[in-house]
Amino acid sequence: MKPKITMGLLLLICNAVLAQTTSTVPLAAVNHKPQWEFHALNQVWLRYNESNPGTTVLGEPQSHTTDIGLRRTRFQAYGEVAPKVFLYFQVGQNNFNRMTNLNGNRKNTFFIHDALCEYSVLGDRLKLGGGLTIANGLSRFSQPSIATILALDVPVFAQTTVDQTDQFSRKLSVVARGQIHRWDYRIVLSDPFPVQSNGVVPPAIGPNATFALKTHRMQQQVMIGYNFFDQEPLKTPYMAGTYLGKKKVLNVSLGAIYQGNATWYLSSGNNGLDTQYAAMKSACMEVFYDAPLNRQKGSALHLYLGLFSTNYGKNYLRFNGIMNPADGLTVAGLAKDAGSQYGNAYPMFGTGKVAYLQQAYLLPQNFLGEVSQHGQLQVYATECLTQYQRFNDQTHMNWSCGLNWLMPGNQSKLTMDLSNRHAIQLFQSDLYTVTRKSTFTIQYQINI
């Protein structure tokens, strides 16, 4: 995708907005009463984790850990403050456990996740907005509705720049999105943050690509999808994980992200080592199916397949551990450009290819008895296969399976999840070892 194409589309949309603003304000707008919604969410984890080899916690070797944490705590306020005018705010915090340490201070402060202003130019056919927002162009899992996550967690690799050049996947952006007949689209122009402001000392430039400390380019994103049955809600930019049989949804989507000079690395030249810049280019094709099997009994089926091409530049690789329960390693000689490798970390992001699959079955409502008294069960499984350039395109797989107890729906949800990951240790020589490690997590979510 070329930046000129995205800019041209945005200019055409801006012209449409200017044409709309020449009309007079109807009397109904003056008398309009704002319609606000307020929501709160908390996700608590109790977790047992088999540690990566050599892991330490506060200086003590630990082959396994048990921890309690807050995966997400959020407050949302949004609504139509005037006809066609939509305002969305979200604040919160993420990944708060015993290892939380912000410059020697465990007092984790809430920060702004979203602050989006949006105007409906042509109803749902065209909405224009701007601000700090999750809206982007790659995949539905790049902008997930956290209250409706189907598995224990989302596939975070789809949030390509999370906490590198964004604010927990949110970016300062201008957005055009909408639905035209059965087509759903979004076009986004984002202004990335410099990587050196993410709170972590960035690695020095080396032979493998890392996010560049110099130069700045805007980021262009686009996503388009076709809905075969029910259309998905368009009120906020977030995309649902599951509708629990309330909708019949089948869509196919294509998405892409492009940013020039996003990463850099050193290459051998005539005069020694030369600094080379690389564009970040990622694309996705995905199929999402979420529909009732038996409406009378309340059973439902969920299937998802996403094929991703993620290009960050030469040999880019980054480890990440969700709410990591550890803080150190006894192993020497590990690669310094790929992030921390202790605890539950694994190579989550990289230049290469990724396939992500997700399946679920929502059991009939009366499987446990009266659903209003006993809730409903949902079983699920996920598989993630990666082929990263840094590992010579060798295939590695992570998987998980679990059970959701919905009491009722996602408002009160208990999840039990077993996951298994490839625990890779990557050395500076680019040699690596592979073992398998598991994690068992119990989550309780309340969403109001």
Regions found by a protein language model. Give the residues of each.
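Outer-membrane beta-barrel pore domains
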Residues: 51, 61-62, 244-448
